[in-house]
């Protein structure tokens, strides 16, 4: 099935690429890479190569209020990580004497700091006691280290190294006797606290303004009698919103409030603000911890309904479609009051409960009362049977032939009839039936021959012995089965 019946498939011959000629060795040129060139090629352009500079060990303390920066600033290598450490004057002199002797080349290259961006300050020759106290409060007392440097490029201290600037005498200019710093931290005097600032600002204000500010911060307290409610009236006078709270009895109305207010106020129902939250009301004090009812007068302000953009676009789309249908006449301009008027009328007639819902129990009770008041019409029956005592055979009242069922038994008087319409309207037009009926003295005579006049005027006879099953009782009564 998979192509085996067709035979072997002829495979194409693979195409072989022509052999390529080897590349002659004269094309390549080998050059010996120098060490300097390799370092230059591998070094990024953003990091220029710096020659190692000896890092001596003296550390200097800057002035709190430094002098103006120097005009000429040499290229200084610095490294700052922590605030400067205070040193005594004698210790600085001893360190400065040993600095020139340590000029051995170092293997450590510190980071270069540009002197164009950083401020440059001179070292102060003297530190005042107040400045020393401020420095100790800010950074704590600095321990003095007695360790000597082991190498010219590495200086070891027991405490953390926080050198602000590191220079050598070779970088000094001829006319300068003090080193130049590229980094400095200024100590500002302690600023007054927030409370002190507030007091200074309040001292500048007038005493009358201070009283107004204090009075505005005191909450308003209103004492109300029990069993009362508040009416809130808001209006704007000269651009200033004003609010009036009127306490009234529990049964008071809007008309009573209008009568209480002065006539100068323009009473408008729209001025009664019913949308103001209770949080904005002044603080109220009620007797016995009770809270009166607050009744807002006027129509409720309809708040806008917030929808998302998708719902908004859909709403606008439906409005456009409705306008198009109304313009074309396919949609009536006035909507129908009820979709089915008959259902509405039926709903009005139904009984409802206290909550407005339909009450099915009341409907069932009303229907049962109607059925009990209209009792069905009972069937007429014979007074006596032939075997029973009878006073006068001529007084037997025979029922109408429609009510007599020759094939059935005795009808129970307590059983309601289900064919009232047939009884009332079945043989009403036969008014001459009783006149043509002949009296019978015995039941057998009546049972053998039942005679009645049909609507067409013919006399019909029915023989009851041939139909049904004989149900003769012990007393000789004969009945027929239904």
From Swiss-Prot:
Pfam families: CBFB_NFYA (PF02045). GO terms for molecular function: DNA binding; DNA-binding transcription factor activity, RNA polymerase II-specific; DNA-binding transcription repressor activity. It comes from the Eukaryota. Disruption phenotype: RNAi-mediated knockdown results in ectopic expression of the homeobox protein egl-5 in the head region of hermaphrodites. RNAi-mediated knockdown results in morphological defects in the male tail due to cell transformation defects whereby anterior seam cells adopt a posterior seam cell fate, which is indicated by ectopic expression of the ray-specific protein pkd-2 in the anterior mid-body region. This leads to impaired cell identities of the rays derived from seam cells. These animals also have defective cell transformations in the ventral cord and generate two extra serotonergic CP neurons. Belongs to the NFYA/HAP2 subunit family. The gene is nfya-1. It comes from Caenorhabditis elegans. Residues 94-110, 363-375 have a biased composition (Low complexity). Residues 336-361 bind DNA. Disulfide bonds: none annotated. This is Nuclear transcription factor Y subunit nfya-1. A motif (Subunit association domain (SAD)) lies at residues 306-329. One of its GO terms (cellular component) is CCAAT-binding factor complex. Expressed in certain parts of the gonads with high expression in fertilized oocytes in the uterus and mature oocytes from the distal to the proximal arm of the gonad, but weak expression in the syncytial ovaries and immature oocytes at the beginning of the proximal arm of the gonad. Highly expressed in the head ganglia neurons and the developing hermaphrodite vulva and male tail. Weakly expressed in most somatic cells. InterPro entries: NFYA. The keyword DNA-binding applies. It is found in: Nucleus. Keywords: DNA-binding, Nucleus, Repressor, Transcription, Transcription regulation. Residues 1-160, 344-414 are annotated as: Disordered.
